[in-house]
């Protein structure tokens, strides 16, 4: 990501080459998510992984009910436009826009963030990254929109999705002179009136 807001873009492209050549970098591991779901979309079924998040979203006007279980323990049903399950890297992506917390990238957690929840007392939930998350959607609409980062598929409203941390991670170069807090300050204009 070389965009303005993407937090993986805290390294300026012009600075990367010289820092790598001079050894002024570290390699960090970023957790990836894996989904257990059949979407009918070969791109998603053959590579069921995401760096930032998986989302389920209503496909029409009817509200989406999402039953969530954490290691087999059932949570109250989320009634919302949708639900996001993100990594700590994804905490500054869609989850942040939906009111989720900012999480330092080295944190070993997953974030469950409702999208426009019907009940105002429903809040994002942070769970350990070794948690097995299962989602079951139901809606009066026939289908649900499912995404893995920016890849999209339509799945039946009764579908179930299992989400866990992948057995591999994304290797990312971080320049020694860059840090996440400075990137937050710069990109979110913290401290500016």
Feature locations, PLM:
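A generic structural signal for short beta-strands and their flanking turns/coil linkers
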Residues: 29-33, 50-52, 62-66, 81-83, ...
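Catalytic core of DAGKc-family lipid kinases
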Residues: 4-81
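Glycine-rich beta-alpha junction loops
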Residues: 37, 58, 87-91, 116, ...
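ATP/nucleoside-binding phosphotransfer catalytic cores, i.e., glycine-rich phosphate-binding loops
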Residues: 43, 48, 56, 71-74, ...
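Short aromatic-centered micro-motifs
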Residues: 68, 90, 146
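Short glycine-/acidic-enriched loop or helix-start segments at secondary-structure transitions
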Residues: 8-9, 95-97, 122, 173
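Gly/Ser/Thr-rich active-site loops/lids in small-molecule metabolic enzymes
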Residues: 77-121
């Amino acid at each position: 990501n070389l965009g303005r807001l993407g937090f993986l873009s805290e390294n300026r492209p012009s600075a990367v080459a010289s820092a790598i050549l001079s050894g002024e970098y570290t390699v960090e591991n970023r957790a990836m998510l894996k989904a257990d779901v059949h979407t009918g979309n070969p791109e998603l079924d053959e590579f069921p992984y995401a760096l930032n998040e998986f989302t389920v979203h209503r496909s029409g006007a009817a509200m989406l009910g999402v039953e969530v279980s954490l290691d087999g323990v059932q949570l109250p049903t989320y009634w919302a436009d949708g639900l996001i399950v993100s990594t700590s890297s994804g905490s500054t992506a869609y989850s942040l826009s939906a009111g989720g917390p900012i999480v330092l990238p080295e944190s070993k957690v997953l974030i469950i963030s409702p999208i426009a929840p019907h009940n105002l007392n429903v809040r994002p939930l942070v769970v350990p990254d070794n948690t097995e998350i299962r989602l079951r959607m139901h809606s009066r609409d026939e289908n649900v929109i499912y995404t893995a980062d920016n890849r999209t598929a339509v799945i039946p409203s009764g579908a179930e999705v299992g989400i866990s941390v992948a057995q591999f991670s994304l290797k990312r170069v971080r320049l020694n002179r860059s840090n996440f807090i400075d990137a937050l300050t710069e990109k979110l204009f913290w401290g500016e009136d």
